From Swiss-Prot:
GO terms for biological process: L-histidine catabolic process to glutamate and formamide; L-histidine catabolic process to glutamate and formate. The lineage of its organism: Bacteria, Bacillati, Actinomycetota, Actinomycetes, Micrococcales. The gene is hutU. It catalyses: 4-imidazolone-5-propanoate = trans-urocanate + H2O. It is found in: Cytoplasm. This is Urocanate hydratase. InterPro entries: Urocanase, Urocanase-like, Urocanase_C, Urocanase_central_sf, Urocanase_CS, Urocanase_N, Urocanase_Rossmann-like, Urocanase_sf. GO terms for cellular component: cytoplasm.
Length: 557
């Protein structure tokens, strides 16, 4: 892409913008494109197939130039990765408002999106790529860890501490990019063995370098031997295998390899980002661009073969789930009629957490100093002394997770918890315990910020899977509450036409104004999750609303 260059975020406490409220989005935009963070930084692609941080390098330069001069009573407007205006607002307003990839429903198809993208009119923002709060593979790691912990409660048995474990089980998955790369470490943190398949050897090498993957096998026979030995010894191990999942999954099924858990996190949401059988890795992007319709058909046929094998494992007694990449629907379109025989991960494991407003709470140290994250880790443990799962996660993350770009951390916190962490971080900045401000955000995958019938809102109790008012309300609420930047995206995770979602990021800069904003944003944002699930009829959400004082008019008499 014209204008490509290496980008890294500034570190330290010296401002390059006019305040931390504008320095923060500037640094996080740059961090998204750090070579240690982004999948294809020269193309502005951060993760998730083609999820970009900016539409093109000229737009990137325009965003950077504007953020360095933006005042604290001004708001930058970003339309699908392109800076389109600056308006005078007020100090409580967001400094940046972002809308990415949004299309009128009848036009919300991949072919139409690609036509508009080719004209330079839009870009695919994924979830945290175009909203500038991607923190590398760690960003999805705890959610993946929690998912496999829930799987362990179904298929595993308690370890010495009485906690369900995946020890003695083998998980098969595919896709080891920015999102899928969390899977091998999440499985091993839960005590299990993981075999992860990816067509790109460089992705596997990168996950080994960042300690998300233990080792790479020399071939299928070697991979199976390593995994079966570790499973027999009840030893945690993750093994990468270079191969195409559409070939490997059916072959493992044919061999009768005893696999306990099966999922997938390839970029199936975009058929052009899934390599079909018979296409060489080096020919991938050229073939996809030359004949996109033919490539899409071939990719879907390959997905159909992979999903058919997944259903074969299901029939053989394995725990099988869709990890939110639309592979079931793509396989259905590829001609496989049992594609929905297994559930998505949210209804299977995560929805009880969403009913409590619990979801991915992440923060990054703008200083670039890992000591600041270590200090915030201690603060979180101090704030929530009775949360054993949280303590186990924070300790494991501190020991096992390598930082990518600016040091960062993620943990799942719920309604009534997130604002406590935000306020504590702000106090630590004010006192000098932290050497620079902290940015606090989340994935768009959260309790009340997504409409995605194949993922976050699949199988809602009241049938409201496709109701998209909720993420729009979420963005409006965060804008009204004082978030530093707010985003509304379309198509993240599951692909164009299948989701609407919103995000927020807030800055803890140590000021009283920041404290007031943080208390509102970090209360109201997860509060939307409780409200959404109360409205859908979830009893646990009703209990949380009553216990924690969330007002729901239709529940008031």
């Amino acid at each position: 892409m014209d204008g490509a260059r290496e980008v890294r975020s500034p570190r330290g406490s010296t401002l390059t913008a006019r305040s931390w409220q504008t320095e923060a989005p500037l640094r996080m935009l740059m961090n998204n494109l750090d070579p240690d963070v982004a999948e294809r930084p020269d193309d502005l692609v951060v993760y998730g197939g083609t999820g970009r941080a900016a539409r093109d390098w000229a737009s990137y330069d325009g965003i950077v130039r504007t953020l360095t001069t933006l005042g604290d009573d001004e708001t930058l407007l970003v339309q699908s990765g392109r800076p389109v205006g600056v308006l005078r607002t007020h100090e409580w307003a967001p400094r940046v408002l972002i809308a990415n990839s949004n299309l009128v429903p009848d036009w919300a198809t991949w072919p139409e999106f690609r036509r508009l993208e080719h004209l330079g009119l839009t870009m695919y923002g994924q979830m945290t790529a175009g909203s500038w709060i991607y923190i590398g593979t760690q960003g999805i790691l705890q959610g993946t860890y929690e998912t496999f912990a829930a799987v362990a409660e179904k298929v595993g048995r308690p370890d010495d501490d009485g906690v369900a474990s995946l020890a003695g089980t083998l998980t098969l998955t595919a896709g080891c990019g920015g999102m899928g790369g969390a899977q091998p470490l999440a499985v091993t943190l839960n005590g299990g063995v993981c075999l992860v398949v990816d067509v790109d050897p460089e992705r596997l090498r990168r996950r080994v370098a960042t300690r998300y993957l233990d080792e790479v096998a020399d071939g299928l026979d070697d991979a199976v031997a390593r995994c079966e030995a570790a499973k027999l010894e009840r030893r945690a191990l993750s093994v990468g295998l270079v191969g195409n999942a559409a070939t490997v999954y059916p072959e493992l099924l044919r061999r009768g390899v005893e696999i306990d858990v099966v999922t997938d996190q390839t970029s199936a949401h975009d058929p052009l980002s899934y390599l079909p059988e018979g296409v060489e890795l080096g020919e991938w992007h050229e073939a996809a661009e030359a004949k996109p319709e033919e490539f899409t058909d071939r990719a879907r046929e390959s997905m159909a073969r992979q999903v058919a094998a997944m259903v074969g494992f299901l029939d053989a007694g394995a725990e099988v789930f869709d990890y939110g990449n639309s592979i079931r629907d793509e396989a259905r379109q590829g001609g496989y009629d049992r594609a929905f025989a297994f559930p998505g991960f949210v209804p299977a494991y995560i929805r009880p957490l969403f009913s409590e407003g619990k979801g991915p709470f992440r923060w990054a140290a703008l200083s670039g100093d890992p000591a600041d994250i270590a200090a915030t880790d201690r603060a979180v443990l101090d704030l929530f002394p009775d949360d054993a799962k949280l303590h186990r996660w924070i300790r494991a993350a501190g020991e096992r997770v390598a930082y990518q770009g600016l040091p960062a951390r993620i943990c799942w916190l719920g309604y009534g918890e997130r604002h406590l962490a935000g306020l504590r971080f702000n106090e630590m900045v004010a006192s000098g315990e932290l050497s620079a401000p902290i940015v606090i955000g989340r994935d768009h995958l959260d309790a009340g910020s997504v409409a995605s019938p194949y993922r976050e809102t699949e199988a809602m109790a009241d049938g409201s899977d496709a109701i998209a008012d909720w993420p729009l309300l979420n963005a409006l609420v965060n804008t009204a509450s004082g978030a530093t930047w707010v985003s509304i995206h379309h198509g993240g995770g599951v692909g164009i036409g299948r989701s609407i979602h919103a995000g927020q990021v807030s800055v803890a800069d140590g000021t009283e104004l920041a404290a007031a904003k943080l208390e509102r944003v970090l209360t109201n944002d997860p509060g939307m999750g409780v409200i959404r699930h109360v409205d859908a009829g979830y009893a646990r959400a009703d209990e949380v609303a009553a216990e924690r004082g969330v007002r729901v008019p239709m529940r008031e008499s």
